[in-house]
Regions:
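Charged, low-complexity intrinsically disordered segments
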Residues: 1-177
Length: 177
């Protein structure tokens, strides 16, 4: 089963939470969306010590590992806020970084799909090759990041219509990054 017209599969690269990019959110400067997510996770649970360690860390892998050490963490509470947090982060990321925003606009009109074979929450739990061969109804993951990026792209296309139109008509490859 092939989905090249409908989907834009990504895992790493510009649409990844680990992509280096400077952004400001709530007066705090971050070097990756992963850093922002882990910081806001720590702050949600009022763990200011780990939050500061996350800000001091420059590597997204280290930032993620620190995010797993948040004291007082509750999966149920995180589930209530995680999508809104990641939405706000990605809106800031693409609004404040024109080059990344243009790359996001180049995926119009395709639905963004995080083809991560290891992530069934933010991704689909399959790599792009296997996803293209599988009915989307059977993808094991939720694709929360892909859904959020699709929403952010739509909203930013309304905010930057000329840029979105120019980028989406460039005929970029949309199957993978």
């Amino acid at each position: 089963m092939n989905h090249p017209v409908t989907y834009h599969f990504f895992w790493n690269g510009p649409f990844s939470q680990w992509q280096t990019c400077h952004m400001e959110l709530d007066g705090v400067v971050f070097n990756t969306a992963e850093q922002a997510m882990m910081y806001l996770k720590a702050m949600l649970f009022d763990d200011k010590t780990v939050a500061q360690e996350i800000l001091d860390a420059t590597d997204p892998g280290q930032q993620k590992a620190l995010g797993r050490k948040v004291r007082g963490f509750s999966e149920a509470q995180w589930d209530l806020y995680k999508e809104e947090i990641v939405y706000r982060i990605n809106r800031a990321k693409y609004r404040q970084n024109k080059g990344l925003r243009r790359k996001l606009f180049q995926t119009i009109p395709h639905m963004m799909i995080e083809a991560s074979p290891v992530d069934t929450i933010w991704g689909i739990g399959l790599d792009a090759k296997n996803a293209a061969l599988t009915d989307p109804e059977l993808w094991p993951g939720q694709n929360l990041l892909g859904q959020i990026l699709t929403q952010v792209r739509t909203e930013l296309a309304d905010e930057f219509p000329d840029e979105a139109a120019a980028c989406s008509s460039e005929g970029q490859e949309t199957l993978n990054d």
